[in-house]
Amino acid sequence: MKSLKIGLAMLLFALVWMAGGTEDAEAVKGDNELIAAFVRNGDLWIKRNNQEKKLAGGPFIRNPRWSFDGKWLAYTKGEFEKELWVLELSTARSSLVHPEGGSRFQWSPSEEKLAYQMNGQLQYVDARSPNKPLGTADGIGNYSWLPSGDGFFASSQSELLPDGWTPIILYRIPIKALGDISQYITVHVLPKQSDDFFAVGTSVFKWSADGRWIAFLATPTASLSADSNTLCVVSADGVVFRTLDEMVNNAQWFEWADRGDHLAYIAGVGREATRNKQLRVLAVTTEKAAEYTPKDFVDQAFAWQGLAHMVVSRAVESKEGSGLSEAAYPYLVRVELENGRQKLITKPSKKHGAYNPIALHSMLAWVKYNGAEADVMLADENGRHAGEWIKRLDIADSYYGQWNWPAVLSFYCSK
């Protein structure tokens, strides 16, 4: 793979401290209509403009997710039960969708319909009648809505037989055919188990902005998937299938740009986020690739800013064998993708870190966390004029340093 390696000396020369200041984050937001759903003390809140409002009480609310039009929120409730709920913002009325449906759920990209999956069964409901499933499909390994919202892209469940695991089939399922496997459209069959490829499941599926490609992780058995999974792409017609790289089982760590066929991901095996994690960007059609993480550093989360820039959460790489005990707090860096130039957005600190960068039109948000308290910061797209916008956010779960901040924070920004 041809790559654009940014050496440490060049990085230190290019890094520029961009002062944050203490300005009111509302001044940065300007006229943009920005709403955040967040979790505080296990309860669900929203912030709109400069007003905060509690919407639903816990215990242990997590995973707030907006409907496509910003009129509904879906969320989970309960640390172990994972009840699935929907809430209509205009009435603040919550409704239970399913007492066990909160593990995998997704809003339709075009309607107020919510899909969820339990034990290999996929169902979807209308948000206004959440207790009446509109369709059901069995034997589903994982799924995502089609970009049009008129069906699903799904994988089958692999089964262990005496001669090995059955291959995984990728389907396109028209919404009217849900439940009738004879009408599922086979897009591609993944390779059988071999020394070069082993998968018994998949992650969710993510479509490129041009609609030509689908990215996903092919995952081995649970004990292996924590450390290494195969990042794959398949063309929308199923003709072309490629394995791209190895990475951890973290669906937040691969994302398409909002235009074209550019895919960014955090590469590197091993479950620790503090070692061997590199930001790479690939133009899938041409296979032109670039790497942006300097030697002795790790990248742990990122956000696209158009096709020209990216913001990444970066930290000094921990020493081999030290695990998380010597993990450094991450800071934000803005990368120019064409030439590799990089600039500091937040200053490296031994007191707090900058996590989960989120691009919001002309703004940039992230989580500031010091090991005990978490706040949401808001700045302009270059990271300037930063200020606290939400205080006392619940602390997200971390798996070997892989932080799941979307479980407690979700933005809706109207265009």
Language-model-detected regions and their locations in the chain:
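Hydrophobic membrane-insertion alpha-helices, especially the h-region
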Residues: 9-14
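Bacterial N-terminal signal peptides that target proteins for export
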Residues: 1-8
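Sequence signature of WD/YWTD-type beta-propeller architectures
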Residues: 15-415
